[in-house]
Amino acid sequence: MSELVVALDFKDAQSAIEMAEKVRGVAPWVKVGLELFCAEGPEIITRFKEMGFKVFVDLKFFDIPNTVKGAVRSATRAGADMLSLHALGGERMAVAAREGRAEGAGGEAGPLLMAITILTSMDEDDIPFPVPNGLGSAVLDLALASSQAGLDGVVCSGLEVEAIKEKCGKDFLALTPGIRPASVSDDQRRVVTPSQAVDRGSNFLVVGRPITGADDPAEAARRIVAEMNS
């Protein structure tokens, strides 16, 4: 069954925790991104874990292998349940991330490692270099390389999930941002609705502003979960 991840893209812990309280019991996951993590540090992960959430730490690691290894080790020890890293970092970086996870987990499974292919805010016009076979082909190549390097899945548009599952296997996880009910797209380009994402095989759906910007965030989250399960 697909799971809802609420993106808590706030500038401070108080705002994020207040929103988390509103969706607690509806969404099993929250996402901590760059702004919140840089403002509050690893302690914010602990706060959400104490509230009963699983935590996706979305820092999009992309550096030399040894640096990524250390970052993943630290994030694992901080309690992250899922981490993101760029597929463009290549096999050595992916292997280093797995090593960091193993060291940080102390014999436990550790967090899921999800590779970023192409950001869902981007389309072909945003890529600053030629993509000869198109954006979809590039996403598939990055997904396959991530699978072969032993990562758990990819962060990808819902438009690409079916092709990725076909190429990498159904056990290769897909986490889909750019989820917009009623086709509200704002600054996301490659978007799908909750039901479309689930139908195409997404394992995790990341939703931010349609929930956090709603007059009643809990009800907005419930509607999305209902659509996911319909």
Curated annotation (Swiss-Prot):
Pfam family, one: OMPdecase
Enzyme Commission number(s): 4.1.1.23
Residues at which substrate binds: 9, 31, 58-67, 120, 180, 188, 208-209
Transmembrane segment boundaries: none
Pathway terms, separated by semicolons: Pyrimidine metabolism; UMP biosynthesis via de novo pathway; UMP from orotate: step 2/2
Source superkingdom: Bacteria
Enzyme class: lyase
SUPFAM superfamilies with a match to the protein in the record: Ribulose-phoshate binding barrel (SSF51366)
PROSITE patterns listed in its UniProt record: OMPDECASE
Keyword set includes Lyase: yes
GO MF: orotidine-5'-phosphate decarboxylase activity
A biological-process GO annotation: 'de novo' UMP biosynthetic process
Keywords: Decarboxylase, Lyase, Pyrimidine biosynthesis
Catalytic activity from the UniProt record: orotidine 5'-phosphate + H(+) = UMP + CO2
The UniProt record lists the keyword Lyase: yes
UniProt subunit comment: Homodimer.
PANTHER family linked to this entry: OROTIDINE 5'-PHOSPHATE DECARBOXYLASE
Protein's job: Catalyzes the decarboxylation of orotidine 5'-monophosphate (OMP) to uridine 5'-monophosphate (UMP).
Family: Belongs to the OMP decarboxylase family. Type 1 subfamily.
NCBIfam families found in the cross-reference section: PRK00230.1, pyrF
Protein's name according to its UniProt entry: Orotidine 5'-phosphate decarboxylase
Native organism: Maridesulfovibrio salexigens (strain ATCC 14822 / DSM 2638 / NCIMB 8403 / VKM B-1763) (Desulfovibrio salexigens)
Gene name in the database record: pyrF
